[in-house]
């Protein structure tokens, strides 16, 4: 089960990293934004992450970690997809969806970290985190290398839409993998 969680996490990272790299271009090209608006989007995304982390820390939802992770994947994917199909006049909506993306990230990263901490023996935890970080970065690097070419070929907004769909599908798929959904029931 934990192996599948890590595979899903690597896939999500593969599709999210190009979006992170393209945020400034999306603002400049699709929304004819200014340097100030590029900064604003980055700020709003970061504020969303901060607020999401605070909310997760205060709220402490009574939802299974894998469910929270999968739901956050779907929310992130939907908000990225919608950002990709917004008309150029919808900068304010784009800014709002940037906050939503940021808000959803702690609801993935927090439960993922906690899940690893509860399922892996403490003496191996550092090595597992190091290995996972290295493994998840490899496909991200490949995705980032191809991002510029793909964005030039099909447009930045289309990359957002396609990556958003891929994230939604990956997050939804995780709900149908029994070893993931039963992971917290195994004790």
Language model: regions and residue ranges:
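Juxtamembrane cytosolic amphipathic helices that cap and anchor the N-termini
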Residues: 1-12, 90
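C-terminal transmembrane bundle of multi-pass solute transporters/carriers
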Residues: 2, 17, 23-187
